[in-house]
Curated annotation (Swiss-Prot):
<keyword id="KW-1277">Toxin-antitoxin system</keyword>
<comment type="function">
    <text>Antitoxin component of an atypical type II toxin-antitoxin (TA) system. Unlike most type II TA systems, neutralizes the toxic activity of cognate toxin SocB by acting as an adapter to promote its degradation by ClpXP; degradation is dependent on the N-terminus of ClpX.</text>
</comment>
<protein>
    <recommendedName>
        <fullName>Antitoxin SocA</fullName>
    </recommendedName>
</protein>
<dbReference type="Pfam" id="PF13274">
    <property type="entry name" value="SocA_Panacea"/>
</dbReference>
<dbReference type="InterPro" id="IPR025272">
    <property type="entry name" value="SocA_Panacea"/>
</dbReference>
<comment type="subunit">
    <text>Interacts with cognate toxin SocB and with ClpX.</text>
</comment>
Length: 188
């Protein structure tokens, strides 16, 4: 059976990230790269559970502050911990110009992104990290699983996300010392 991330109905993760940023801006919700990563991950997980297929193509990895989509991370990493005002771009193969990646039009995707923003969009980056680190959740199973030797940088496959996503429903508390200036960095 092929991996779920190869589903032809999944969408360019940059397009979904741009949609999330556009909808967040319309709701006056500022989003940092760290928050974007977590919200995109939560939307992807909900989509896997609710629709039985992945929301975005590619994969998430277990990084220090939770799940990260490396392609989306690279698009917005120049922002550091600041709020994102730009959009993901791509190179048009016909013109050679760099253009903004168009958000998807699929109504299910729009509704899924809106639901995540309305339920989690105003949470701090630290709170989103705490939820993504839930015991028994996908990130925890990969990053802290037996034999992983601190599995940071390991892929979190869609099967693990779908099977373990129910553990993401936890009460949110911010560990002492975590502020909203957290910045993710690739595992070394």
């Amino acid at each position: 059976m092929p991996p779920l991330t190869q589903d032809p109905q999944s969408v360019d993760a940059r397009a979904v990230a741009n949609l999330l940023l556009d909808k967040a801006a319309a709701l006056d919700i500022p989003i940092s790269n760290l928050a974007l990563q977590k919200l995109l991950y939560f939307a992807h997980g909900r989509f896997l559970v609710d629709k039985g297929r992945p929301l975005v193509n590619g994969f998430f990895e277990a990084w220090k502050f939770g799940p990260v989509h490396p392609v989306v991370y690279r698009c917005f990493s120049a922002n550091g911990p600041k709020y994102i005002i730009n959009r993901a771009i791509k190179k048009d193969i016909l013109s050679g110009l760099h253009i903004i990646v168009s958000p998807p039009r699929d109504q299910d995707i729009h509704e899924g992104i809106e639901r995540v923003l309305l339920t989690m969009g105003r949470m701090s980056a630290s709170q989103l990290v705490a939820v993504s680190h839930a015991s028994g959740g996908p990130w925890d199973v990969i990053a802290n699983g037996p034999g992983t030797n601190l599995g940071l940088g390991l892929r979190i496959c869609d099967k693990v996300i779908k099977d373990r996503f129910r553990f993401q429903k936890v009460s949110v508390s911010v560990p002492p010392g975590l502020g909203d200036t957290l910045e993710e960095a690739p595992p070394s």
